[in-house]
Swiss-Prot record:
Belongs to the heat shock protein 70 family. GO terms for molecular function: ATP binding; ATP hydrolysis activity; ATP-dependent protein folding chaperone; unfolded protein binding. The keyword Repeat does not apply. This is Chaperone protein HscA homolog. It comes from Pseudomonas fluorescens (strain ATCC BAA-477 / NRRL B-23932 / Pf-5). It comes from the Bacteria.
């Protein structure tokens, strides 16, 4: 059946003319480019017949080297050879310093706290390094397809935040690529397996690459992909397996933990070779310098068990978020070269109670799926109809309200693209400006969420508190990028911002935000209720104080005023504590003792308005 076609700007106005578009898997360890040829999606090889391009960039004084030769030069030229740059995309220098032991580079801070890597050609940003990899893939594709590309679908981990996604788009632009869309890697894998055409039900995509882990739970209905939930870890992957083996070698060989960059690189290469050998063998002899020892698969499994357990914990969380049971998952797709590790496959099979799908090369499956989507977005009709992909945002988006509270506007796991609006008002009389603080996270207090951006809405007409109506609109596009606007509906004044944070989340912060939201859910609810009661109490105190200053002497006797002021003082003292119930009850008492005063003020206002006017004037 024909499904709803995704139509985006730039599609071909000539549907019978095939436009050249590719899918790119920009990976931590390796990258690939794929395209549809003769109706089949396949990876494109270079002149030597190699499909996989190592994500390695080596800088010389007068040229740039990309790929396998650059990777092999890493031990001898570690400071000019950049590996695993995907881990640095969208991050700040402070984040990078936490990875210092794993990254043998010299870093300098650039604009917006971006880390630059010192090379023989000068400082290079992660965006520039990634652009070199993308440039080679673009040139390979144009040579293989015999023409200029109209664009590419580039895959990213589902857990990439706004900064990391924007950095990826910037790298593509620098490489001369038009980005048709950023596509979550797990979703691309589902497309590659043709699950949109042959299956209905719930599918899990387990994606363990070189530097990142993603789990996505998809529901497939009539060819439509709906991502029910996503999870993962931006700092978990095959690189960590290598570091675990390297640690085993250091301990066994009695090496110093403080190694120079070249030694670190050669050590990691030996560790990686051992890991790959254990994929098919029960044991491997590891040789490092004069030291040699046998590493068995059982010992290797024990080394990586904590990391495998971390991935399964994220899987259980994603299944819970999707509101499905484990036995409802009908298929598990394995993605990423690290899923070749036998212990990983065993653990996934044990958890889901079924053997995972591994028929398509896990290193190629993402690029193959991205190419299918790229062909559709380029305007080329897909045999069997088009497909609709519904991705989701990984963390809730919202803004700060009075009392330091997080008001969620778009909940996590909402399908994108999406636009949501919510109305807010002013807190004080005569307020003419409002600060809009955009946040990301699952907790109730802003101190426990991540700040994304701030902007001011100015020019609000002065009114009494609560009279102005400000509509705040959140929009998340198909690439997961956020824009926020605020508009005062009466005057039409408006302000907006596109959220492009200068760096991303620190290692473990994404997973920790979700973990904390569950762990502290009860405490957060109590804290939110307390803050709301404190805000209500403060608002009442300010209103009563304003009324006393304006009309207290005229409308109250000394005893009445003293009673009100005593109740205000007691409420102020309670607000400094944490007894929410006491604050609520005292707020009610203050409201009650001021009822008569409020009625007198209203009568006085009405009398003043009617003074000197006859009945006929009022009726007119």
């Amino acid at each position: 059946m024909a499904l709803l076609q995704i139509a985006e700007p730039g599609q071909s106005p000539q549907p019978h003319q095939r436009r050249l578009a590719v899918g790119i898997d920009l990976g931590t360890t390796n990258s690939l480019v794929a395209a549809l040829r003769s109706g089949l999606s396949e990876p494109l090889a270079d002149a030597q017949g190699q499909v996989i391009l190592p994500s390695a960039v080596r800088y010389h004084a007068d040229r740039v080297e990309v790929g396998e030769s650059a990777r092999l030069a890493a031990p001898t030229d570690p400071l000019n050879t950049v590996l695993s740059v995907k881990r640095l995309m969208g991050r700040g220098l402070s984040d990078v310093k936490q990875l210092g032991e794993q990254l043998p580079y010299r870093f300098v801070e650039g604009e917006s706290h971006m880390p630059f890597i010192e090379t023989i050609q000068g400082p290079k940003s992660p965006v520039e390094v990634s652009a070199e990899v993308l440039k080679v893939l673009r040139q390979r594709a144009e040579a293989a397809l015999g023409g200029e590309l109209v664009g590419a679908v580039i895959t990213v981990p589902a857990y990439f935040d706004d900064a990391q996604r924007q950095a990826t788009k910037d790298a593509a632009k620098l490489a001369g690529l038009n980005v048709l869309r950023l596509l979550n890697e797990p979703t691309a894998a589902a497309v590659a397996y043709g699950l949109d055409q042959h299956a209905e039900g719930v599918v899990a995509i387990y994606d363990l690459g070189g530097g990142t882990f993603d789990i996505s739970i998809l529901r497939l209905t009539g060819g439509v992909f709906e991502v029910l939930a996503t999870g993962g870890d931006t700092a978990l992957g095959g690189d960590d397996f290598d570091h675990a083996i390297a640690g085993w070698i250091i301990e066994g060989a009695g090496l110093s933990a403080d190694l120079d960059p070249g030694t670190q690189r050669s050590l990691l290469q030996a560790a990686c070779a051992a890991k790959e050998a254990l994929t098919g063998a029960a044991s491997v002899e590891v040789v490092y310098g004069d030291w040699r020892a046998t590493l068995t698969r059982d010992a290797f499994d024990a080394l990586i068990e904590p990391m495998v357990a971390r991935s399964l914990k994220a899987c259980r969380r994603a299944v819970r978020d999707s509101n499905v049971e484990l036995d409802e998952v009908q298929a598990v797709v394995m993605v990423g070269g690290s899923t070749r590790v036998p212990r990983v496959r065993e653990a996934v099979a044990e958890m889901f109670g079924r053997q995972p799908l591994t028929e398509i090369d896990p290193d190629q499956v993402v690029a193959i799926g991205a190419a299918i989507q790229a062909d559709t977005l380029a305007g080329n009709k897909r045999e069997g109809g088009e497909l609709l992909l519904l991705d989701v945002i990984p963390l809730s988006l919202g803004l700060e309200t009075m009392g330091g509270l997080m008001e969620k506007v778009i909940p996590r796991n909402t399908t994108i693209p999406v636009a949501r609006a919510q109305d807010f008002t002013t807190y004080k009389d005569g307020q003419t400006a409002m600060m809009v603080h955009v946040l990301q996270g699952e907790r109730e207090l802003i101190s426990d969420c991540r700040s994304l951006a701030r902007f001011e809405l100015r020019g609000i007409p002065p009114m009494v508190a609560g009279a102005a109506k400000i509509r705040v609109t959140f929009q998340v596009d198909a690439d997961g990028l956020l824009s926020v606007s605020a508009r005062e509906l009466g005057s039409g004044v408006e302000a907006s911002i596109q959220v492009k944070p200068s760096y991303g989340l620190t290692d473990g912060e994404i997973a920790k935000m979700l973990k904390d939201s569950f762990q502290y859910a009860g405490d957060d609810k109590v804290a939110r209720v307390l803050r709301e009661q404190q805000v209500d109490a403060q608002r009442l105190i300010e209103a009563v104080q304003g009324a006393l200053d304006a009309d207290g002497e005229r409308l109250l006797d000394a005893e009445e005023r003293m009673v009100i002021e005593l109740q205000m003082q007691e409420l102020s003292e309670l607000m400094r504590g944490t007894d929410g119930y006491a604050i609520e009850q005292q707020t009610k008492r203050l409201s009650q003792v001021t009822d008569a005063f409020a009625a007198r003020r209203l009568d006085s206002t009405v009398k003043a308005a009617l003074a000197g006017r006859n009945l006929n004037e009022i009726e007119e």
